[in-house]
Amino acid sequence: MNIEDLKKRQEKIRNFSIIAHIDHGKSTLADRILEKTETVSSREMQAQLLDSMDLERERGITIKLNAIELNYTAKDGETYIFHLIDTPGHVDFTYEVSRSLAACEGAILVVDAAQGIEAQTLANVYLALDNDLEILPVINKIDLPAADPERVRAEVEDVIGLDASEAVLASAKAGIGIEEILEQIVEKVPAPTGEVDAPLQALIFDSVYDAYRGVILQVRIVNGMVKPGDKIQMMSNGKTFDVTEVGIFTPKAVGRDFLATGDVGYIAASIKTVADTRVGDTITLANNPAIEPLHGYKQMNPMVFAGLYPIESNKYNDLREALEKLQLNDASLQFEPETSQALGFGFRCGFLGLLHMDVIQERLEREFNIDLIMTAPSVVYHVNTTDGEMLEVSNPSEFPDPTRVDSIEEPYVKAQIMVPQEFVGAVMELAQRKRGDFVTMDYIDDNRVNVIYQIPLAEIVFDFFDKLKSSTRGYASFDYEISEYRRSQLVKMDILLNGDKVDALSFIVHKEFAYERGKLIVDKLKKIIPRQQFEVPIQAAIGQKIVARSDIKALRKNVLAKCYGGDVSRKRKLLEKQKAGKKRMKAIGSVEVPQEAFLSVLSMDDDDKK
């Protein structure tokens, strides 16, 4: 193809993604678009086709972004090339959304006709506006009995400020309005800008590891073109590779002769080392490099940290390899090696949120067959010491001695909770219980309220989302962003078994709740840890001060069983002998801590706590 033909082809390309709150029908709409454009034969079609991970299909959520090429013949008789990039809707996967939006010129905003705008819808719309995307509102599920499209249309205009007069009324399930959506994409989404004859600049927005072909990069070509045989260079580290194959996904990978400006596809270049490629990096040609890299993504900082340890210690290296492969496919995961006296060798991992942590743990166990112990999640605290230093601590066992601590600051988040009016009281009560500070409250319409609180992140990573859903019967939607660090009265609580600290059970707690929390954990551990031959005291301590204690009684043999009658001194002698043996055992004995003990620190219910 000559340059002119490529430029004409570029004018026919439309890159768009679908953004929505969880469960507003995003993946179903993607299915209908695939059917309508006959990208997938009816034999291969299955519900939520783009959610290819078993975990995604089971939980009914999208975790990974997916990029697919479709051909659509519009009413004007021209054939257009669509690149559909499906994105997740959950707050923990916002990073995936921001990556896919950077590869697009337009976004379809799906809003549920019954539920209206939710917190996550807003968050994703603002991401799309930051990327200067053309936004096409679609009001979905209009066939539901509770649907009220006109109210939702007014909401889109009032709350988001988009012109919704031409919003498509659709039902992805029933296949209504799909053609109208496709026509709007042709008319309203701009063709990609960029020069075919400029030096190559391609943005890596995802990558996956293939055992045979090495790392496969998913890219959006911004300028120039790339074909098999080219020598490409990574702009962040200067590493070069020979391209073996380029192509597109239809969801299956299909090889092509070239990828040109505006295309979204994959590049395979026999890249064997996972660390050589980074999502957000720019690829260029080694013999004709671009002058500067593309504006990448802002690096996401993990919010929640937890220790991951293999149950079988010989699986440590397998766990490292598994984490490296997952990191390639999930750029927001971070990890570093750490050791624990109680659990041996493992990794300290950083996640974007609790669902992200859950999904990573499940993927490690499923895809790589590694059984794991996970320690209680914690956040990054700023510890100011008495000698003027500021330490960033994410692991409770690394906290300095209490005598060295001057003050501790913890991260607060701005939590936006959208909730029906009748549940406002329940939400406010929950937020206060989680040490939240009320900021403001707005009415979206007659029935729905947007409540904003400042809440410590440590309270949110625990079980806030579950509690919010149960106290509002599932009607509340929730989105949060980190706002600031604030000084708080925090203390580190250690758990001692038989006088020895168990580092993996340490946690940070607010001074106010320290006693209840300590008592609760001590009582829980008493039920879980098996009885030993000697008495085991379980203590919760802040520094040197013990705040709660519970004892596991010793198992004992009845040494008096064979004494019938006889002198009392004979019995006493046997009892003293037994006591001395127990004492010796206690001095040298160690207590095995079962896996459930670590999990019990995690599953601290508020109902137990209060």
Swiss-Prot record:
Transmembrane segments: none
Similarity remark: Belongs to the TRAFAC class translation factor GTPase superfamily. Classic translation factor GTPase family. LepA subfamily.
Cross-referenced SUPFAM superfamilies: EF-G C-terminal domain-like (SSF54980), P-loop containing nucleoside triphosphate hydrolases (SSF52540)
Binding annotation for GTP: 23-28, 140-143
PROSITE patterns: G_TR_1, G_TR_2
Protein localization: Cell membrane
Role description: Required for accurate and efficient protein synthesis under certain stress conditions. May act as a fidelity factor of the translation reaction, by catalyzing a one-codon backward translocation of tRNAs on improperly translocated ribosomes. Back-translocation proceeds from a post-translocation (POST) complex to a pre-translocation (PRE) complex, thus giving elongation factor G a second chance to translocate the tRNAs correctly. Binds to ribosomes in a GTP-dependent manner.
Entries under InterPro entries matching the protein: EF-4, EFG_III/V, EFG_V-like, EFTu-like_2, G_TR_CS, LepA_C_sf, LepA_CTD, LepA_IV
Organism lineage: Bacteria, Bacillati, Bacillota, Bacilli, Lactobacillales
One GO BP: positive regulation of translation
A GO cellular component entry from the record: plasma membrane
Name of the molecule in the record: Elongation factor 4
Catalysed reactions listed for this entry: GTP + H2O = GDP + phosphate + H(+)
Molecular function as annotated in GO: GTP binding; GTPase activity; ribosome binding; translation elongation factor activity
